[in-house]
């Protein structure tokens, strides 16, 4: 007889199986462990373990229409498709980036709200979100039982950002051309840049997507950063005429291999241009591009997830958190605070600045040492004043790439620790 615990496991296995295409590595690992349990318990359960699943939503969206076409009579819901990084929140109860399958940590309150929306309709396959400038907006909701409008209303009541949408009855065959596209796009009337329009005919599940645009090439004068939050900066690509080309995040910049004083391919919309999301031309490896872009942005910044952050006092905050002492705003305050604790003072004395700084940032030791062994440092008065990576091949390791993107912060913390050691023990 099947126990209640077994039924719980089987229900979870079924739920994970249905949302595999939207799963991250943790969910896949959980799924595989349940498959292994089910196979050993029941011998045959009808599903198999998987190695990796690329996040895809192609079953729910038709091919993009980029030329005028006739739209049939009927009742339609039109939705904006926003510029930004696309994420899927599904029954696996995790936020997964479309295409890469990478999971993304969201605030607990947002996760709770997403779960409430999912729990309110068993027919929801997934919620589609867009992240731009560190802001989330729910872009679509796929349900077998109801239109996205009803789900948007519920999500809005819970405090999520939802799109403006348009409900229209089309009474006769109508040409969907640039003029109609522009009318619908303007009706959405919000501040998020829109790259296309999707629509659903009443009674149908699949979305149709319309994207009228032109390709162009623009000359890049500079690569800068724009502040979008508390110590959060997004890459900004500026043309020779001073216009700004929209960039999703740091990875978008890297993939496109943008370089100052060269031309880049863009998608031109009515009111803005988008950095074309493709693996840019040229022979540069990803590692070489990362090095060049970080050098261009400058040593005052480090890669912080999808964006940049300024080194500033962030190192002091992380160091005080690691040492479990009161927050300090200057090195003088830090020295005074350390002197209050014999345990902390002994830790500073016995542990190298190198190891303490690495631990403070949580870098894996083996990957960190591999990176450092491929770098050359300029040291003055025991502090790092400059560094250069001599072999970018090691950046093919995603973990090492992350550490390198964050390395300016490591240098800041290392120099603080070095300064503190001098003041305490010399």
Swiss-Prot record:
What domain of life? Viruses
Which GO terms fall under biological process for this protein?
DNA replication
Which Pfam family, any one of them, does this sequence belong to? Chordopox_A20R
Which key words tag this protein in UniProt? DNA replication, Phosphoprotein
* Quaternary data: Interacts with the DNA polymerase catalytic subunit OPG071. Interacts with UDG/OPG116. Component of the uracil-DNA glycosylase(UDG)-OPG148-polymerase complex; OPG148 and UDG form a heterodimeric processivity factor that associates with OPG071 to form the processive polymerase holoenzyme. Interacts with OPG117.
Family per record: Belongs to the orthopoxvirus OPG148 family.
Q: State what this protein does.
A: Plays an essential role in viral DNA replication by acting as the polymerase processivity factor together with protein OPG116. Serves as a bridge which links the DNA polymerase OPG071 and the uracil DNA glycosylase.
Name under which the protein is recorded: DNA polymerase processivity factor component OPG148
Protein source organism: Variola virus (isolate Human/India/Ind3/1967) (VARV)
